[in-house]
Amino acid sequence: LQIGENKLTAHFLLQTKFIRWDPVNGSGEFNIKALYVKILFFDIIIPYDDIAANFDIECIVKYPNEISILTSDESLDPSILIKLPQGKILSIYLLTSLILAAIIFTVILFLSENHRKLKKLHTRLSTKIYDERAFFKKLPLLISIACLFWIFSLTGYSISIDDELAIFRQDHSLWIGQGRWAVFLLTEFILPQPIIPFLPHFIFCVSVSVSYLILVRAHGMELSWKNIALFPIFMAFPTWYFIAGFYANILAVSMGLIFTSITLLIFSHSLSKINEWKILDKTFFLLIFIQAFILSIAIGCYQSYIFCFLSMGLGIILLKVDQNSSISNRYIIRSLGYLFLIVCASLLLYYSTDFTFKFIYGVSSNTYISGFINLEALLKFPGDVIVSTLHEAKQIYLGSSKIFGVSLGAIGCLLLTGVILSLYSASNWKVRATLLILMFGCIISPFALTILGGGTRSIPYRSMVGVPYVIWFFSALAIERKNTVITFLITTSLIISSFQIMNAHSNYSAVKQLTLERDKALAAEIYYRITTLIPGNDKLSSYKVDFFGSKPFNNIFPRIATSTIGGSFFDWDGGNPDRIVTFMKVIGFDNINTIDSGQRRELVGFYDEMPVWPSVDSIKMVDTVFLVKLGERPGLMHQFKEQ
């Protein structure tokens, strides 16, 4: 147990009647607020009357909303007994078995009734996949290229801000509160501990390679040497690195990218019959539902994929117009309406599923996602918000070093070349006007959340997952032109941009690694200094520690404004004792704990007379608490309002 609120889980067999819990090694007092057995979606509350003393327990006091347990003064291994509600558990198991049996029976009945149709569908799908075998033979090559660009992330292990909390997380329902129910499913059933080296990044390398194959196919292109050369721009763009800075995001983002690409493939192929469908056509509604269902899963992985798909969909329509200047306005309008319906239907399915998960698991929405939305700023200053968003978009698409820390100017040349060549090759001004409108929509869609958030830097750069697609798409438009000079210039720009992207990865990896090494060394030195102050007759097995202020780490490598890359655990939030202590536990100093806010308020005055680290007296022992002063300015947790 740590000081503060703890949520603990334990697994047991069906026939278990009692559980013995040994909460602490030594004496102490603790309160239980809630105790329940969780089976699938059901929470069976264990009444306080079913909690009894077992060994070294002085007394148990039961209150309406909690139960207080006090151990004996000389206790070494106190324990309590918890009686499990076996009758209710067996009832839930029986009900679940009946529901599963009903589902299995329904599936078998459906398969038997639709056997011939399903067999035809299976044959068609098998033929399609077989026809694409030559295309997918290049998948190992793409995976190899991806692994080359992500080599440091694959071979290293550099945790950053928030990873320290995720390592100890046992309850993954936090993701449901953020509206990322697909992340909850992936973390709960596939990768319960996502903060590990190699595997998450390797999954991303495979996923981004598969997604790229699907993406190229959705645009009706072949995987020629040109599109292979374009792959690094899509796969290694810094946006992905910013997301991968948090290990817990990687699996969900990888799966979300695949689902988004599959939705785009269906959308692209179905556009050929857009003029033939009627509004009440069953096939039309079925296609809408299938695409909305797949895309809703992608949104459940990472909400920004809705804007990514919107950008991709506009790109597909733009490509159709670029390739066929005689295309009718009716086709364009119907295509845009079709895209709009898919987006709306996917959002409807996403929010319905989100509501269902929150209802089943009893989780309410937290303020993390909603905190990014600032409609008040948009309504009060719409002009300023739009202008600042356009300015930020310009800096990102031109590869400004102010955004990425290093220059990525070559990608800006690729994007501008694609735009200019597409407009130049248009047959008349009407086509150019149509292309220009579609281009603007495609380019600005990844920044829709920035507009809703109130403008520049209101949204982390990692959320702009549509940007790599936009740059790849316009680069592909340029390189597909059958002109030797243009091909040479684009190829040269590609080589330069690939080098610049690899340089960006190298710089980000350097700042992450150096910051982590400094934090580890600082943690070890602080722990050593604490141990020198421990009295010789001390028998405590753990120690209370509080940190005041921050100790920033400044180096020559770039820091990204909205990213945790290079963020120090001793500097975040102006110095956050909970983060610092949790980080120290991760690297092995597991016998230290933080203090609660009440005790922190009582002790904050002692910091006034203490010098700043690394002075000799920058660590002080007050009663049983070690106070560590890292800086002069109080962090968020030491900024108490005067009463």
Stretches found by the model and what they are:
Residues 103-111, 115, 210-212, 394, ...:
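Hydrophobic, aromatic-rich transmembrane alpha-helices
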Residues 202-229, 262-266, 417-422:
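Transmembrane-helix motifs of polytopic, lipid-linked glycan transferases
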Residues 282-288, 411-413, 479-503:
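Signature aromatic-anchored transmembrane alpha helix within multi-pass, membrane-resident enzymes
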Residues 285-303, 308-314, 345:
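Membrane-interface alpha helices of multi-pass inner-membrane proteins
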Residues 308-344:
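Perimembrane helix-loop-helix junctions
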Residues 496-565:
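Membrane-embedded, lumen/periplasm-facing catalytic core of multi-pass transferases
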